[in-house]
């Protein structure tokens, strides 16, 4: 899976004004869990709180906040036919301006989450290694393909780290504890 922190850093660098949209309560059947979050700028979003009308309403409220309409918003949204979302649960959303402290906290947490992902090492970047790396890159894993042939490492899936080395066994010694 692509590392979370670099795209987050890029988003924050490009957006001087950002609202944090957080699921503060999720009851019943909901698209995302309590604690899920996304960021909204005047012209872009990062992340998701579940999509659909719920997310559209939250984005609109976040952009209103960014436009100076209040200092914090709370939304209590029943997910039913009234809004065209069939989940059936109820979600409370908190929306606030992401100041420098909150931005740094989000980045620190993203880096910690990236580092905590399990590490998977694939030895060989041929057709099997490429297929495995493509499948594993979709999961919350740190995937590395270790190979002795430079051309076998070309065009690996996004988020897959590659290592060209004449002695692949050395990568085993460098692997974090618990790697597969």
Which residues fall in each region the model found?
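Segments forming oxygen-rich coordination pockets for charged ligands
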Residues: 1-164, 178-180
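Short amphipathic alpha-helix with an adjacent loop that forms part of the alpha/beta core around
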Residues: 168-178
């Amino acid at each position: 899976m692509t590392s979370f922190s670099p795209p987050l850093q890029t988003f924050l660098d490009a957006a001087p004004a950002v609202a944090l949209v957080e699921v503060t309560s999720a009851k019943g059947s909901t698209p995302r869990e309590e604690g899920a979050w996304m960021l909204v700028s005047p012209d872009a979003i990062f992340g998701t709180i579940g999509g659909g009308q719920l997310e559209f309403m939250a984005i609109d409220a976040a952009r209103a906040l960014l436009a100076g309409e209040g200092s914090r918003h709370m939304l209590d949204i029943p997910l039913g036919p009234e809004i065209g979302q069939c989940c059936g649960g109820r979600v409370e959303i908190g929306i606030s301006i992401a100041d420098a402290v909150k931005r740094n906290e989000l980045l620190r947490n993203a880096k910690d989450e990236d580092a905590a992902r399990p590490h998977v090492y694939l030895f060989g970047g041929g057709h099997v290694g490429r297929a495995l790396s493509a499948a594993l890159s979709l999961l919350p894993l740190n995937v590395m393909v270790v190979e002795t042939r430079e051309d076998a490492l070309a065009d690996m899936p996004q988020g897959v780290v590659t290592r060209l080395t004449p002695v692949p066994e050395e990568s085993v010694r460098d692997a974090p504890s618990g790697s597969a």
